[in-house]
């Protein structure tokens, strides 16, 4: 029985992580080849259209300073709300990193009784669990900081007077899109952190969480209406 418990982590945890990695590779493949089939690509297209219309309306309004100011301020407030949400998640991720670091430094503390865990409960495995969880939160913090950086940059570009040329529109679109992509990457890091968190309860909950999460993410990441539109076009 000890032999089975010792190698249960190696089998189930590896299987759960492999399942998650393969799903995200499939999602990346779909995003590269046909971004509109994924929710991330579809939302990025909507944001590109939004930026284009914001700057186009600004150009058409011309010398009407009040209308132009209201239009730009609306765009800036939308981006600022995204920046605030990003910085909030970055702060939470950094705080959790600090908490985990203090927890690791205190060798006398235990997450919960090890007798409840069906799996490998050696000190080395517990250290690996902490390091994996800490790495996910550090990655999430890094991604959210990069997302906030691009959103702040798009604020500067959007508020630049006379920024209505095609080049200016593309710059704002790229900044907003990159901010959204890093936001999505930060959320993915938190999803992996949830899996590693359940690993503290044993390899079985971790593997089960990975499988359930993949099915939940699939329903969220892929658009059902894109399949219906494709079938209509073929028909």
Question: Where are these predicted regions, by residue range?
Answer:
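Multipass alpha-helical transmembrane domains of eukaryotic endomembrane proteins
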Residues: 129, 133-195, 224-225
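Hydrophobic alpha-helical membrane-embedded segments
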Residues: 9-43, 87-103, 130-153
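Transmembrane alpha-helical segments and their cytosolic interface motifs
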Residues: 72-100, 181-207
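Membrane-interface amphipathic/juxtamembrane segments adjacent to transmembrane helices
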Residues: 28-76
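Juxtamembrane membrane-interface segments at transmembrane-helix boundaries in membrane proteins
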Residues: 1-8, 73-79, 113-134, 172-194
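Juxtamembrane inter-helical linkers in multi-pass membrane proteins
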Residues: 38-58, 117-118, 155-176
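Juxtamembrane membrane-interface segments at transmembrane alpha-helix termini
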Residues: 218-230
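Juxtamembrane "helix exit" motif at the C-terminal ends of alpha-helical transmembrane segments
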Residues: 1-2, 94-118, 201-207, 213-218
């Amino acid at each position: 029985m000890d032999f089975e418990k010792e190698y249960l982590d190696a089998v189930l945890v590896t299987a759960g992580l492999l399942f998650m990695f393969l799903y995200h590779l499939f999602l990346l493949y779909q995003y590269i080849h046909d971004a509109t089939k994924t929710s991330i690509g579809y939302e990025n297209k909507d944001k590109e259209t939004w930026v284009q219309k914001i700057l186009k309306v600004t150009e058409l309004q011309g010398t009407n300073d009040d209308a132009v100011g209201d239009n730009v301020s609306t765009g800036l407030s939308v981006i600022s709300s995204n920046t605030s949400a990003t910085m909030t998640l970055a702060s939470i991720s950094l705080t959790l990193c600090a908490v985990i670091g203090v927890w690791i430094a205190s060798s006398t503390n235990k997450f919960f009784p090890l007798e409840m865990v069906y799996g490998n409960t050696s000190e080395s495995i517990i250290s690996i669990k902490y390091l994996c969880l800490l790495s996910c939160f550090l990655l999430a913090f890094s991604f959210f900081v990069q997302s906030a950086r691009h959103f702040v940059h798009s604020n500067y570009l959007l508020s630049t007077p006379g920024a209505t040329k095609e080049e200016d529109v593309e710059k704002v679109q790229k900044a907003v899109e990159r901010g959204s992509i890093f936001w999505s990457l930060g959320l993915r890091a938190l999803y992996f952190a949830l899996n590693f968190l359940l690993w503290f309860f044993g390899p079985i909950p971790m593997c089960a969480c990975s499988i359930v999460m993949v099915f939940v993410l699939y329903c969220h990441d892929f658009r059902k209406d894109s399949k219906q539109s494709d079938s209509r076009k073929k028909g």
